[in-house]
Structures are given as C-alpha cells and as structure tokens.
Amino acid sequence: MRHQRVDAGGEHMNGVYEALKRTESGERRRGEAPAADDGATRDEGAAGGIRPAPRYGVGPALIAGNDRYGAVNDRFRVLSARLQALAAERDRHLFAVTSALAGEGKSFVALNLAVSLAQNGVRVLLIDTDLRTPSLHWSLRLNPLHGLLSYLTERIDFESSMQATALPGLTLIPAAAAPSAPELFACPRMHKLIAAARAAYARDYVVIDCPPALAAPETQIVARLADALVMVIAANRTPRHAVARALDQLAGCEIAGLVLNRFEPSYSRKAEYG
C-alpha cells in the first residue's frame, strides 16, 4: 500500500509560501493516489437529541491515537496543539478544513484533527459540508440521511442533525450526497447552524470539512463563517498555481494551520500509514 506523510505547517503566510515552493514538483509529477477518507468514532451519548452511537468498527483512515502511526500522530498533535493555543489566546474555536483540489486528503485531515482534539478531553463537533463527495459518515459508520442536508432543507432541527460516534467526545453532523447547491450555504439556515454550533461548543471545538476550494463556490461561504482555516496541500501532487488561486479566493480568512499531506523531505523521519 502507498505510504504517505503528514506535516503540520505554521500559521503565518511565510509557512504558506514555503509550502507553495514544495508543491512545485507537483506541476511536473502527478498521479499520486488520494488519501483515504474513512475513519472512526467517539461516544458522547444520546442526550440533547444526539443520535446513539453505533456498534460498528473503525474505518481505515482513522489513525489518531493508533500507536502504529506514532510519527503521523505526532503531526496531528502538533496541529491540534496549535488550534488549542489559538482558542486560548484569540478565542478561536471553529475551524474549517479545505484544500485547493479534490484528492488531497482534506477529509482525512479533518477527521484525524477532530479525533486528536477530542483525545485531549474536550468535545468536538465535526461537520461534513462536502455535499458533492461526503465521506465522514462512511468513515464513522453512520447514516447520512439525518444530517446537514436535512437540516438545511428544514426537515430536522440542529440537535437532530448531530450523531454521536463511537469515540468519546466526538459528534458528527454528516452529509448526504447532493448536486452542487451553493445557495443552500448562503441561506440564513446555514448561518443559524453555525450560530447553534458556536453556542453548543463555546468552550470546545467545531471542525468543518469543506469541499475543495477551486471546485465548489460554497467553500468561500463556509470558510468565512469559521474562525480560522486549515489548508491541506498534497506536497507532490498539487500545482503551485492551484494553491495560490485557492488562497486568493479565501483571502481574508485567517490561516490557522497548514498541512502538507504526502510530505516526503529526505531529512524527515519516516511516518507511514496505508
């Protein structure tokens, strides 16, 4: 199986610039397999309208907390520690995760970041807003029919959209696959969901898995509703100009962290998953 690496970068724009330089090889070398987008679960109980945790297993993309992937776990701990510092210093609690293009592993990063945060004893709400290719429900073995889409179309309320997972502290609002509908994210209902998430997790964390920035105009809407943004870049796959375009489209969003997926510098210690 293909071995991959994750590297958590800095929050400042010079970190973004260095990452852009590292992706230059991606303009000449393509074809890398995308990161797996399946994962795991935590149990928060059924109180407050949250659906009971399932009794299913854990998907292969969940590596946070698995000793087999120690070095990669360390990268997620670094990233989660950075976000916790932002929460303490600047009152940032709601983070959007995206990438420039599809297949860069942003759902993998969102899932494992959420789990890494929850392992610190806080509650985490993970929201899948990628209606084009939703994956978190599959990773966590949950039913996507009662989630974001049902909420946005006014079929259920906020509490009913949340589903407890098999991992303590982690709750998911899943997404069912649907055609592109940016207007759903621009409606007052989406703003109401974010406001409800902020109120319910005011002392904890919300992680939003957004669609790829260059593929979905709704990402600009969702990212601007968040406190800060985590950008995922496939180091040997994503063209530099694509990352630059994505950052231009998301101008004004605070960069909370940079994740280089499949990051393979010769000086880095090896960290494998697959």
Residue ranges, per PLM feature:
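Hydrophobic positions on the alpha1 helix immediately C-terminal to the Walker A/P-loop
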Residues: 109
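Conserved NTP-handling cores and scaffolds of large molecular machines
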Residues: 20-27, 83-87, 117, 121, ...
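C-terminal lobe/tail of nucleotide-utilizing enzymes
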Residues: 2-77, 241-274
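P-loop/Walker-type NTP enzyme "switch/lid" segment
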Residues: 50-81, 85-88, 99-104, 122-202, ...
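Pre-Walker A (Motif I) flank of P-loop NTPase domains
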Residues: 91-95
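Conserved catalytic-core segment of NTP-binding enzymes
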Residues: 183-274
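Active-site signature of alpha/beta-hydrolase-fold catalytic machinery across serine-
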Residues: 112, 116, 138-139
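Generic detector of well-ordered alpha-helical packing
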Residues: 19, 129-131, 210, 262
